[in-house]
Amino acid sequence: MYGTLLSDNRIQITQWIGLRTPALQNLSVAEGAGVGGRVVSTRRAVGIADYTRASVISHEYDQQIQDEGLHSVVAVPVIVQREIRGVLYVGVHSPVRLGDKVIEEVAMTARTLEQELAVNAALRSSDGGDRAGAKTGRAMNGAEWEQVRATHSKLRMLTNRVEDEALRKEL
């Protein structure tokens, strides 16, 4: 999933792959709340093995997480020119811990997305078409969405390297 940072520092889930229900689609997440909100407030990746029991997050979104059937969640900030642009999420529908390999892959994918966004912004700027402010709440463009698809593809390839059978099936 990808959440776009809005002008009031809320995250809105704007892109998703693999959700089983509409519970998280277009969900608005307050700064500091849940996994994504914590990522925004700390500017750091957060990994949760059991969302509804995690002590490091608030639990405003437990019902939506339960409705979707997610257990483990990793969220990583997407930062361009020192500004958070969004949050990249990966969640698993079974009670398995996402290991360091998965967290590292999500973080590397977020870094790749950051580079793509920075290049796109530079190209728009050089063409005189730069839109002021990254926090406009706009939907991702085709190139940005393609990067999210590429991330999904990388995670699927990572599945082959995961030894835990339950986690491999979930990924």
What is each of the regions a protein language model found here?
Residues T4-L6, I13-E60, Q66, H71:
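Regulatory sensory and allosteric helical modules in signal-transduction proteins
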Residues S41-A45, E105-L123:
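Signal-transmission/dimerization alpha-helices at domain junctions
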Residues G86-V87:
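Short glycine-/small-residue motifs
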Residues A118-L171:
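Signal-transducing coiled-coil/dimerization helices and immediately adjacent hinge/linker segments
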Residues G91-V106, E116:
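Regulatory loop-to-helix N-cap segments in sensory/regulatory domains
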Residues S72-I79:
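A short, aliphatic-rich beta-strand micro-motif
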Residues M1-I13, N120, E165-R168:
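Helix-loop-beta substructure at the N-terminus of cytosolic sensory domains
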